Amino acid sequence: MSEATTTTTTTSAPRPGGRPSGPRPDRGPGGPRKKRPFQRRKVCRFCAEKDTTIDYKDPRTLRYFITERGKIVPRRISGNCSKHQREITEAIKRARNLALLPLAAGHALP
């Protein structure tokens, strides 16, 4: 009684939706990606203008740091330093609790 073993070889066909095997192609017909031009670093406006203060009772100032959807704008976009970003976040949350600022996009601004 000998058992016959059959060996099957599978060809490496690309799976549907998978990445093709082999070396990476070039970046496309346009060639390699171009580098972005140097962008000027944003400066914290509260550090630059010492007379401006962060106050939760001033929704006009805080609206600058809120998106259309009602989310708090991150530091990398607003350009604030970490100290003032924390103060802004705290002030926005306090203003939301007092209904001076909207909680979400569907709520109207006063």
UniProtKB/Swiss-Prot annotation:
Keyword Metal-binding recorded: no
Coiled-coil regions listed in the entry: none
A GO molecular function held by the record: small ribosomal subunit rRNA binding
InterPro entries per the UniProt record, alphabetical: Ribosomal_bS18 (IPR001648), Ribosomal_bS18_CS (IPR018275), Ribosomal_bS18_sf (IPR036870)
A biological process term (GO) from this entry: translation
Domain of life: Bacteria
Basic residues bias locations: 32-41
Residue ranges, compositional bias (Low complexity): 1-18
Chain positions covered by the region annotation Disordered: 1-41
Function: Binds as a heterodimer with protein bS6 to the central domain of the 16S rRNA, where it helps stabilize the platform of the 30S subunit.
Protein name (record): Small ribosomal subunit protein bS18
UniProt source species: Trichlorobacter lovleyi (strain ATCC BAA-1151 / DSM 17278 / SZ)
